[in-house]
Design a protein with these regions (language model features):
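Structural detector for internal amphipathic alpha-helices that build alpha-solenoid repeat scaffolds
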Residues: 355-359, 377-391, 409-423, 428-432, ...
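Beta-propeller domains with acidic blade repeats across secreted/periplasmic ectodomains
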Residues: 1-368, 382, 386, 656
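Cofactor-pocket helix-loop regions in the catalytic cores of large enzyme subunits
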Residues: 22, 170, 191-193, 383-389, ...
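Hydrophobic, aliphatic-enriched repeat segments that assemble into extended interaction scaffolds
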Residues: 24, 32, 78, 83-87, ...
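Gly-Asp-aromatic-enriched flexible segments
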Residues: 506-656
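Amphipathic alpha-helical scaffolding segments comprising HEAT/armadillo-like alpha-solenoid repeats
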Residues: 362-370, 391-403, 422-434, 453-467, ...
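Short, charged low-complexity linker/loop segments at the C-terminal edge of domains
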Residues: 235-236, 350-358, 563-570, 651-654, ...
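Repeat-solenoid scaffold signature
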Residues: 181-222, 300-340, 460, 464-505, ...
Length: 706
């Protein structure tokens, strides 16, 4: 299923590319496919490789196919010139046991389609072996993508990173998921964002806006969140996600069930305007490539998802500089791989004609600099990378950055390319360019983008930008001040680290009308509550303190009772809202969707099945005086334990309940305060924060001190 404006054909089948877990397209059109016949849960050595496919005439049929290299669990690929960056595991044949996961670079100097020997490890141990050994490489570190700023961005799943090490000796540990970045030589590794669950890839637009589509099990089911990644942002998983949402950057949307996989920001001039300049997000569970229409909202965005292309269990997507879009279809290869399943599909606009993209390394200097003015994001990135090999052209590149007639995307590409070419020597010219409001945001970012190249960067330009009229500039300034390392700016950051709500007292919920003890598989509880003064009835199930695994609970025979003793079954009424952390909510149904039965095996057609944590809200019928039910676990629960709570409002279900906001509603008003607080933490500005307690800057100070 594709839009009528596109044409598609099968590029390769399982004979060449079974189990395609990832892919990338070189700017010049070569397609690299990561074949992982272990899938997410399989184990053992020798089941992975990277296949290189070449379609030199643009007819959609590869004339050449070679095994570029053999690696275990290939999960991310980037082609730059004659180098291929590969995210992969290591499973020695001698043990058959996963030993490590690395980011490596392979070279093919003669461009014959086969790597010249073993790859060089750039970052070792980018995912802890223990979890990968026990479960498989499913919540592990996955996709990689190159930004126009020259960093490689790594999508880290909720296995996290423990003891990763770069080529310069930098070590990094990050508990849980997030985005980590590193220079292409393996140096300067650092955390970009954290607090994510199971992301697979990142989409990066020409202005360094970054988007992910991950999933999480901490609310509303196993749901996916579409997130705008803002540098230094904390997105909540797992510690703040539910009960301290006022301290996180919220997602742009909670999109229900699914499994986010590959991601790409598409900006290619050969594509129809309708489908161009958009983030494309793969959803493996829904077999959909999805467009998210993003609209600026302060320093962030709002979004509207739109189905774009249906592809069977789509795992990844990429585009070359001629406009050929490729999608990797897992196509039912299962959780442990299947050599007879999987393929790669090609998409182009109707009427598209193949125009070969020249290798940037072969271009003359003038043509190469001009390529920064291309309307293709792929072409600009390729040009930028080749320009790094020609430092003598730095001034010509800066001329593009200065050119107000150039597109904004071209100017931004030139700013980041110039900084990479000239290093710290670029800072004086860039500081002068900060006076141009059209590019100020990216100038500020480039000045502090690399901590090793900040000589000559003064705090003044960043402090002044905290009060800029553009909220994106404000956020860039706060992030930059945190990286600059000068604690004397703490007072300026404290002034920015307020949401304007610090004076509002948090109102704690009142005690519930009923709260049971912990109920396990051997017990149940009789519930009889006076609801004569209730307007709404909140039926809450929380976990019993041991997590929510198999917490299949039920409100058995729930009824309202009036003063005359007449009973009204809840089954005959309509609830106002019902949300559960996992599974189904329904009468006569367990959370699993099976027939609801008591622990003794008795069918309960009037019972209301649910799962911890859940909240079900009913309007209280006129004349009702009591609510009665029996709370217990369903027969499908194994070792669950829960508590039942009845209240007239949402109670504090666990420690941390209070004045909090939703986890997936855009909140641009929090962004400057959030990154300013993170900057204070990075500057270790505890003394300034303590001094600010009790002043108008208490909110940010206390937030940072926590």
């Amino acid at each position: 299923q594709i839009p009528e404006e596109l044409d598609t054909l099968r590029f390769s089948g399982p004979d060449l590319t079974p189990c395609p877990a990832c892919l990338c397209a070189a700017s010049t059109g070569e397609v690299f496919v990561g074949v992982d016949m272990l899938g997410s849960l399989g184990k053992g050595p020798g089941k992975g490789k990277v296949v290189r496919l070449v379609d030199s005439n643009g007819d959609g049929k590869p004339e050449e196919s070679t095994v570029f290299t053999e690696v275990d669990n290939p999960r991310g690929l980037i082609a730059i010139g004659r180098k291929l960056y590969v995210l992969h595991t290591v499973i020695p044949a001698s043990t058959g046991k996963l030993e490590a996961m690395h980011l490596s670079v392979f070279e093919d100097r003669d461009w014959n389609g086969v790597a010249d020997g073993e790859g060089k490890i750039l970052v070792s141990n980018v995912s802890p072996p223990k979890h990968n050994q026990a479960r498989g490489a499913d919540h592990t570190t996955n996709g990689i993508r190159l930004g126009i700023d020259g960093w490689i961005y790594i999508a880290v799943g909720d296995f996290g990173i423990v003891g990763a090490k770069g080529t310069d000796g930098t070590e990094l540990t990050m508990l849980g998921g997030g985005v980590v970045r590193v220079r292409p030589d393996g140096s300067e590794m650092e955390v970009y964002t954290h607090g994510l669950r199971n992301i697979y890839d990142v989409a990066i637009d020409p202005f360094m806006n970054m988007f992910t589509r991950g999933n999480t099990n901490d609310g509303g089911g196993w749901n996916i969140r579409f997130i705008h990644q803002i540098q230094t942002g904390q997105y909540g998983y797992p510690m703040l996600f539910k009960h301290f949402t006022n301290e996180i950057v919220p997602a742009l949307a909670d999109l229900g069930g699914g499994s986010g996989t590959g991601a790409l920001f598409l900006q290619e001039p050969t594509w129809p305007e309708k489908y161009n300049n958009v983030p494309l997000m793969c959803d493996w569970g829904r077999s959909q490539l999805i467009i998210h229409r993003v609209t600026p909202d302060g320093a962030s965005f709002t979004q509207k998802p739109e189905k774009f292309i249906r592809l069977s269990q789509i795992a990844d997507v990429d585009v070359d500089a001629s406009g050929r879009l490729y999608g990797a279809a897992w196509d039912g290869a299962g959780y442990s791989g299947n050599p007879k399943k999987g393929y790669v599909q090609r998409y182009v606009p109707k009427g598209w004609s193949y125009q070969p993209f020249p290798a940037p390394a072969g271009l003359q200097d003038k043509a190469l600099v001009s390529l920064l003015r291309s309307g293709s994001a792929t072409a600009r990135t390729a040009a930028s990378q080749e320009l790094l090999n020609r430092p003598v052209l730095a001034n010509a590149v800066f001329a593009v950055a200065l050119d107000r007639k150039a597109s904004l995307a071209s100017r931004v590409a030139a700013i980041f390319t110039y900084k990479q070419m000239a290093g710290a020597e670029a800072n004086a010219a860039l500081t002068g360019l900060a006076g141009d409001p059209e590019v100020r945001e990216w100038v500020l970012r480039s000045l502090t983008d690399r901590k090793s190249q900040m000589e000559g960067v003064g705090k003044k330009v960043l402090v002044e930008a905290l009060k800029d009229a553009n909220p994106r500039v404000q956020v860039a300034a706060a992030v930059g001040l945190g990286r600059l390392g000068d604690p004397s700016v703490a007072k300026d950051l404290l002034a920015a680290a307020t949401t304007g709500k610090g004076g509002e007292p948090a109102v704690a919920p009142g005690p519930p009308a009923f709260e049971s003890k912990v109920i396990d598989k051997n017990g149940s509880v009789s519930i009889d509550v006076d609801v004569s003064k209730f307007k709404e009835l909140y039926l809450v199930v929380t976990d019993g303190g041991n997590g929510t695994s198999t917490d299949h609970a039920a409100w058995f025979d729930p009824v309202f009772v009036n003063a005359a003793g007449k009973k009204v079954d809840l089954k005959t009424l309509k609830w106002k809202s019902a949300k559960s952390e996992w599974g189904r909510i329904g009468f006569g149904l367990s959370a699993t969707g099976e027939v609801l039965k008591t622990r003794g095996g008795k069918p309960a057609p009037k019972g209301l099945g649910t799962h911890a944590d859940s909240v079900i809200v009913y309007p209280v019928p006129r004349g009702a005086t009591r609510f009665q039910a029996r709370g217990g676990l369903a027969s499908t629960s194994q070792n669950g334990s829960v508590q039942f709570i009845v209240s007239d409002s949402l109670p504090a279900m666990k420690a941390g309940g209070g004045n909090e906001g939703p986890h997936a509603t855009p909140n641009p008003g929090i962004l400057l305060a959030h990154v300013a607080v993170k900057a204070l933490v990075d500057l270790r500005a505890a003394e300034a924060c303590v001094a600010a307690v009790g002043t108008a800057q208490s909110e940010g100070a206390l937030w940072a001190l926590r």
